[in-house]
Amino acid sequence: MAESRPLSEEEITKIGNPAKPTGEAGSQMLERMNDSHYEVTGWALDFFHFTDTDNILDIGCGGGRTLHRMSERSRRGKLTGVDYSPVSVEESRKYNAEDITSGKMNILQGSVDQLPLPDDSFDRIITVESFYFWPDAVKDLKEVRRVLKEGGQFILVADIYNRDDLPASAVEHIREYDMRNPTLDEFRSYFEQAGFRDITIHLKNGSTWIAVEAEK
């Protein structure tokens, strides 16, 4: 019997489903995303005004590394992760087992269109590389705003946005996975329609990275 060959990264992504990670391929994909999202996330985290007592939410927490990094920046804070993929919830819990055991962190299964969280709960909210797959941009942003405290800070992070010079490979990826990919004007419009204020769009020189920062 011939030995099966290892799956390529592209095959793992297709089987694992970036919109909702599933199965062993999903676990492998999340492990890779913990690394591939590291730099863009670090760039965006510098826009947060962390304090030691923040209540922080990560929507679409994936493999859990962003939660861990924010925990390091808010030593006495409380952190919550939400993801609608059971595989993501499991992997995030594994990655952050120590903080969960101590009671500092909680990771829940849920969707951005109906967050299982009370109103006005969080000082900081972040979402990294998940907005592409949200069901309804404005409605879901309103749901994010609902759980953000008055004066709280929200940052949406993505490594691409709709512009004329996107590589052909990125355009094909967007098409293949039916990803939402707004222009800068569309991003601002979504946030305004959702009721956010003080909207700032950060762009990384020499890249296609974007971080949309706003307050309630």
Model-found features: residue ranges?
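A short acidic, Gly/Pro-enriched loop at the edge of an enzyme's catalytic core
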Residues: D113-R124
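Conserved alpha-helix/loop element of class I SAM-dependent methyltransferases that forms part
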Residues: D35-D54
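Glycine-rich helix-loop-beta junction characteristic of Rossmann-like nucleotide cofactor-binding loops
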Residues: D46-T51, E72, L115-P116
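A short glycine-rich, Lys/Arg-flanked "PGG" loop and its adjoining helix->strand segment in the class I
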Residues: V138-E150
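C-terminal alpha-helical "lid/dimerization" subdomain adjacent to the S-adenosyl-L-methionine
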Residues: R5-N34, Q153-E213
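A short SAM/SAH-binding and catalytic strip from SAM-dependent methyltransferases
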Residues: R124-D136
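Class I SAM-dependent methyltransferase SAM/SAH-binding core
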Residues: N55-Q114
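Short glycine-dipeptide loop
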Residues: T53, L148-F154
